[in-house]
Amino acid sequence: MTEAIRLSVRYLPDLYLPDKAIDLLDEGASHVRMEETFALRQNVQAFLEQELTDAVKTSQFEKAAEIRDKMQKMAARFPDARKSKTVTASDVAWAVSVRTGIPAGRLSEDMRTRLLNLEKTVSGQVIGQDAAVQTVCRAVRTGLSGIRDENRPVASLLLTGPTGVGKTELCRVLAKELYGKEDALIRLDMTEFMEKHSVARLIGAPPGYVGYEEGGKLTEAVRRRPYCLVLLDELEKAHPDVAGILLQIMEEGVLTDSAGRRVNFKNAVVVMTSNVGGELKTEGLGFQPLDHSDRVMESVRQRFQPEFLGRLDAVVCFKRLDSSDMERIAEKYLEQLKSRVQANGMQLNLPEKLAVSLGAEGKNRGGARSLRRIIQERVETPLAAFLLTCSKKPSKIRCSMENEEIRFF
């Protein structure tokens, strides 16, 4: 009962006590009964099949009749076994997970421990952006600690910096850590809303227009999954009217769609990314040893209105990646390639200097996305050609580098 009250207050804020706690107990009890009934039927079926098979093989028809009687007695005892089951905290967590989409295990996990370890977990997957990760995790931790304004989203963040430095990757990792799955990330490309008439698609087309029954791309996605991370990519390319919609979300935590339904953003993390300030560079795209955060912030203040910036919980500047960061990212991509090859029943051995060479080339040509393309051109394409020329599927694949040329054998 205590767990039902705690979880209902935490994850079902739009409903009221005691109804929402009672509903969770009812759904948990139904879940227990369904699982128990299924397990008992499976046990009875396995028992009867084995016993009857043995009796028929040995022509023991009297024993077969006894098994039939035993079956009836066991079936009569099943209701008593179901009544003896109790609803546990894990059953209540399962009921909440069905409504919110958050895995049941995370509902029962210690929230305090998870938030304290958030920076360490995210930093291990987002390379070279420790300061940005710390700022984002601090804002999210404050929003989930219970002291935030309940009428606002968990956090409203603006991530700025050049392309290919990890802004989108950070959002993907954060969504998985907070809500258990990467599909908790609702991503909208703001290049689709550059025209004034396209802004209405966020909340739904007006009555009489095409697409009115479909709902808004933003409001409908959040209405179906209120516990999510909303990512608005490349915000500076959107029409200025989009800012008016975001002001209401960041201040009130709700938005009314074209059908008159109030969509709740109070349990969502709202993240906007921008490449404003990305032109402040003297080297290749995405890399610069100097810290230009002050100049980036000045560009942000010139691009966005003060009332918009004033409603943000944090403006996070992503730094340009250096050679060591690129080498670590190359190692990460190569490990992913090894995993894909291993999934096909083969083992791929790569030299250590390959990551160093790819990282140096990626630094000269662009950010992490360019590095991914370099790996595809220099490693994946030759590897695919090598596999096609093999008459038999190899168990081990080795790689060598001579004069920056990669060969497989």
Predicted regions: what is each one?
Residues 1-409:
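AAA+ P-loop NTPase nucleotide-binding core of proteostasis motors
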